[in-house]
Design a protein with these regions (language model features):
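Conserved helix-loop functional segments at active or binding sites
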Residues: 5-13, 90, 126, 197
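Residue-level signal for well-ordered alpha-helical positions
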Residues: 7, 87-88, 194, 239
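Conserved AMP-binding
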Residues: 24-30, 37, 53
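Short, glycine-/Ser/Thr-/acidic-enriched flexible segments
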Residues: 28, 54-55, 81, 112, ...
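Conserved ATP-binding/catalytic segment of the ANL
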Residues: 178-238
Length: 240
């Protein structure tokens, strides 16, 4: 509940208009089973199961579902958005349905290609007259999942925003990067039946060591948010 409360507080429109989601994410994944499903439940919204997926061989189902039902909040991975903007560029019925009441577009899990971000903004202006808020989100299973989100419009992809309400963030210098550690009511208390891993995963102040590095968009203005700067042990993310 704490993670859903954080998101609701960050985006006031959710209270004014109960969210409508059309979502493909498996409920075995914390983003689908907690964030997406409970966002609708917590706010008296409507949750439609998308039986498609961001896979070229399965995306036709998603196209049909989004043509039938336009969401107000939409989440996908970058590959899903790439397939979506390609289809909307030639499918007017899909684009009209998708944009008729959309308020927020969210992606996570990988880097968003610039051309996909720009094409989505172009389509949103074409069908709504304005740029729809299109943002990255950051977190992990242990953070329920989202722990940062942007609160201002970004003109380019990748900004993961600032800590959500109730989240404490600690930044530890790590070479030319900052290791990020997190604390809040949405953070897991530990790993089931694994005391050793639990002890290794928290510092002496109770901050969860997520294992990632971040960098400021602008060090002189932290309110502008952060960018993901790789794992501490590796500096790459898969595209999907």
């Amino acid at each position: 509940c704490s993670n859903i409360s954080m998101a609701t507080k960050a985006y006031e429109f959710i209270k004014e208009e109960p969210p409508v989601l059309v979502d493909w994410m498996p409920w075995s994944h914390v983003a689908g089973g907690n964030k997406a499903f409970n966002l609708a439940l917590y706010n008296g919204g409507t949750f439609y199961i998308d039986n498609g997926s961001p896979n070229p061989n399965d995306f036709a189902k998603t196209v049909k579902n989004l043509t039938d039902i336009g969401p107000t909040w939409y989440f996908n991975v970058p590959k899903g958005y790439e397939l979506l903007v390609t289809e909307m560029s030639k499918n007017t019925l899909l684009a009209k349905s998708f944009f008729k009441r959309i308020k927020l577009l969210v992606y996570s899990g990988a880097s968003m290609p610039n051309h996909v971000f720009e094409q989505m903004e172009k389509l949103s202006v074409e069908y709504t007259g304005e740029k729809i808020f299109f943002s990255a989100a950051y977190g992990a299973s242990e953070t329920a999942p989202m722990t940062t989100m942007p609160t201002h419009r970004c003109n380019f992809p990748g900004n993961i925003g600032v800590p959500q309400f109730g989240t404490e963030m600690k930044l530890i210098p790590f070479g030319d990067k900052f290791e990020v550690r997190l604390k809040g009511p949405h953070i897991t208390p530990g790993y089931w039946n694994d005391e050793i891993q639990t002890l290794k995963s928290f510092d002496k102040d109770g901050f969860f060591k997520i294992g990632d590095a971040l960098k400021f968009q602008d060090k002189s203005n932290p309110d502008l948010g952060f960018y993901f700067d790789g794992r501490l042990s590796e500096n790459f993310k898969l595209n999907t």
